[in-house]
Regions:
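Acidic, surface-exposed loops and disordered segments
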Residues: 1-216
Length: 216
């Protein structure tokens, strides 16, 4: 008996996610140490993340928008991958990018916890984390999947403790929907509301070079 299209799509998505993990696992790492954790979140996890993001409407309208979007996305075959890592450095680069003179000094600093991550954190660990996510997204694109990296869903998955022993996280969402769902999320807002919200959350995007005056 012939295999139904939906089953083929679901099975293909599962195999694609496995290849995305391989690509992320084998991606470049500063320091040559592979400390990034990777997990595929369940549909129930995604529902919880979507509701959490949507609840942040007053604090972060963009997170609320992405939560509403995820609620619609999971109605079709899709997957959400979570990437996480610890904040402390074992690299001993002593580059100062974290704001401390040495890695040891940063590692000894008092931990600060927020909704989105724990800090202070090694910038190279954060770069490694995003390189892994980018490698997974690149593999998804090569396999013909629709894909997008989400920081909003990442910090929501972190806040909800979807992965143990990590201090920062990012997510990669992939879909086999008929049309690309990731770059048409403005359907929930009018153009005026989008501009107002974007200027509120990212005021530096409305500024030019140093010395420019902010829009009133």
């Amino acid at each position: 008996m012939a295999t139904e299209m939906n089953e083929l799509l679901t099975n293909g998505l599962d195999r694609a996610v496995e290849l995305m993990v391989v690509a992320a696992h084998n991606s470049f790492r500063f320091g040559g140490r592979n400390t990034v954790k990777i997990a595929r979140l369940t549909t129930e996890d995604q529902q919880e993340i979507a509701q959490f993001c949507y609840s942040l409407g007053d604090m972060s309208p963009l997170a609320a928008r992405d939560g509403r979007f995820l609620m619609e996305l999971i109605k079709e075959p899709c997957a959400l991958m979570m990437f996480g890592d610890r904040r402390k450095s074992d690299l001993n680069f002593n580059c100062g990018a974290c704001g401390y003179k040495t890695c040891a000094e940063m590692n000894r600093a008092e931990e600060v916890e927020s909704l989105t991550a724990r800090g202070p954190s090694c910038q190279f660990k954060a770069i490694n984390l995003n390189i892994a996510a980018g490698a997974a997204a690149s593999m998804a694109w090569r396999l013909g999947l629709y894909c997008r990296v989400f920081s909003t869903l990442g910090f929501a998955s972190f806040a909800l403790n979807k992965m143990e022993n990590v201090d920062m996280a990012v997510t990669v969402s992939v879909s086999v929907a008929k049309n690309d769902p990731y770059f048409d999320r403005h359907q929930y807002w009018t153009d005026e509301h989008w501009k107002e919200t974007f200027n509120k959350e990212f005021p530096t995007f409305t500024r030019g070079f140093i010395g420019a005056i902010e829009q009133e």
